[in-house]
Curated annotation (Swiss-Prot):
CDD domains: NT_ClassII-CCAase (cd05398). CTP binds at residues 32, 35, 116, 159, 162, 165, 168. This is CCA-adding enzyme. It comes from Streptococcus pyogenes serotype M4 (strain MGAS10750). GO terms for molecular function: ATP binding; CCA tRNA nucleotidyltransferase activity; magnesium ion binding; tRNA binding. It is an enzyme of class 2 (transferase).
Length: 402
């Protein structure tokens, strides 16, 4: 197969391939970018593989950076762009089901491609637009099928994270997993416990943000892989609820909304501990737990001004997005009206602060000062007090007199 037109991302990088070939080596576009071009999807990263060894690659170009030279990767700075160029390589026995014990550089493209995970990711493209397909990846692309390169059992035993990648690709590409590949994923799912939680989180997160995320979750359920992921053991019912409880065409607006609804569907009692088990950042934990709290408030009643002040318009909109996907009542105009009606959006908007209370009223730093500031803040938010210096002073005097 030959591409009639090279996408602009590849055209810009063609001089890189040309320079390498003029130096006497082979060079090709490889991996996900080739797959995405053939599927007419946006290209994110342009990866180049070459028969030149790292030091040989560095000798060809004036500006290079050693970003992973021990694995054969050199970053080339050329024509205003940055390109990762990796030497063809083979990999020795894997340790810990996630990384090869040794990487060996080779001159053969086919040897390099055979170590890759799925056939649709094992395609290469030369400078003339000719697709090199050693493992029937083009047929799999045409039939929307995800199939492991070579023996599926070996691919997943080498790197168990490929199981999560399989679920993610099913979700992002809307592909079905080929039977032998699926069976190997199922039988090797216990190895997911050997994978770092951070790497599993990255793949699961990408799955949830994919347009066909239900397909990825369904495959995960069918493989029973969830039993080997943090907080998901014996959670099949909750995962099924996650799939069926939202409208068919719904996709999550952002990562916070996705993980919040995962925990809502699973009826997680302690969201923070659940997210800690996934080793997420403290900021992520705080935002998602607040989002769940606001979702539960909305289950009981309509939003009020204090809700929008405390949680923010953006978070309230994420809640309404989930409600809309469940065919529940939604009122985005109400959120906008409440936000517009707020005299302040955070305590720093208040014209009077603690320093004024200490200076003008002789208050001491401590709990009483903090309580007075909270009273002022709440009164302004609820519309009982204007955000005006003189008015607030009068309010404070009255409060201190009682």
């Amino acid at each position: 197969m030959k591409l009639m037109t090279m996408p602009s991302e590849f055209q810009k990088a063609l001089p890189i391939l040309t320079k390498i070939k003029e130096a006497g080596y082979e060079a090709y576009f490889v991996g996900g970018s080739v797959r995405d071009v053939l599927l007419e999807r946006p290209i994110h990263d342009v990866d180049i593989a070459t028969s030149s060894y790292p030091e040989e690659t560095k000798a060809i170009f004036n500006r290079t950076v050693d970003v992973g030279i021990e694995h054969g990767t050199v970053l080339v700075l050329e024509n205003g762009g940055e390109y990762e160029i990796t030497t063809f390589r083979t990999e020795d026995v894997y340790v810990d089901y996630r990384r090869p014990s040794q990487v060996s550089f080779v001159r053969s493209l086919e040897e390099d491609l055979k170590r890759r995970d799925f056939t649709v990711n094992a395609l290469a493209l030369d400078e003339n637009g000719q697709v090199i397909d050693k493992f029937r990846g083009l047929i799999d692309l045409e039939q929307k099928r995800l199939r492991a390169v070579g023996k599926a059992e070996e691919r997943f035993e080498e790197d168990a994270l490929r199981i999560m990648r399989g679920f993610r690709f099913a979700a992002s590409l809307d592909f079905d997993i080929e039977a032998a590949t699926f069976e190997a994923m199922r039988s090797h799912s216990p190895l997911l416990e050997k994978i770092s939680v951070e790497r599993s989180f990255t793949e699961f997160d990408k799955l949830l943000m994919a347009p066909h995320w239900r397909k990825g979750i369904s495959a995960m359920i069918a493989c029973q892989a969830y039993d080997y992921l943090p907080g998901l053991k014996q959670r099949e019912a909750g995962l099924n609820h996650l799939i069926v409880s939202l409208k068919d065409n719904f996709t999550f607006s952002d990562h916070h909304q996705a993980w919040a609804y995962v925990m809502i569907s699973l009826a997680i009692e302690d969201p923070k501990s659940f997210l800690k088990a996934w080793k997420t950042s403290n900021d992520f934990q705080r935002y998602v737990t607040k989002l769940i709290a606001l979702y539960r408030i909305r289950q009981e009643r309509s939003f009020e001004k204090l809700d929008i002040y405390q949680y923010g318009k953006e978070m309230a909109s994420l809640v309404e997005g989930l409600r809309k996907a469940q065919s529940l009542s939604v009122d985005m105009d109400h959120i906008e009206a409440l936000d517009q009606a707020l005299a302040i959006h955070n305590k720093h908007d208040i014209v009077l602060n603690g320093s004024h209370l200490i200076k003008d009223f002789g208050m001491e730093p401590g709990p009483q000062l903090g309580l007075m500031l909270e009273k002022v803040e709440l009164a302004i938010v609820e519309g009982c007090l204007d955000n005006d210096f003189t008015t607030i002073e009068a309010f404070v005097r009255e409060e201190l007199a009682t």
